[in-house]
Amino acid sequence: LLELPRVMFGALEQDTARRIAATQDAGFAGYEVSNIAHLRLCRGLSMTGGFGLNITNNVAAQFYAEQGLSSLLILPEVKDSDIASIAPACNGKPVPTGVMIYGHMPLMLTRACPLQNIHDCAHCDKTGVLTDRKAKKFPVRCGLGVRTIYNPVPIYMGDKPGALAVDY
């Protein structure tokens, strides 16, 4: 799967469309879409729903299933007991759902660089850290014209393998 950018500002939308056209016959399994605009860019191609679609309920899951997504990632904010109720179907067949089991969740996307007071973009290695008043360190990663600020505490659901009603 090729992951598409969660946000596309300005020329990045055209660049993303160009890259999709260049890779659609390259043997990849499809595209992970994280933005509703990706549905149009990938129309007719194999798509799976990623984190950026914010799937937290059956209405959203059903909408994306009807748009042709072959599987969907449910946000970790959904209670374990509610995951089973998010069960989309398309043409009478269930659409697989999944959850993130481990990782640092993105908290915020920003176009302005929060690290700019430390160094300019020309001297940046595209990684950094913001420290809050409680000394928590929030990783910052830059790319494709945006900066992503991550939660310093990773989610972990590896201790619930049988309790999660998902396919992956």
Q: What residue ranges belong to the model's regions?
A:
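Active-site pocket-lining/capping segments in soluble small-molecule metabolic enzymes
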Residues: 1-168
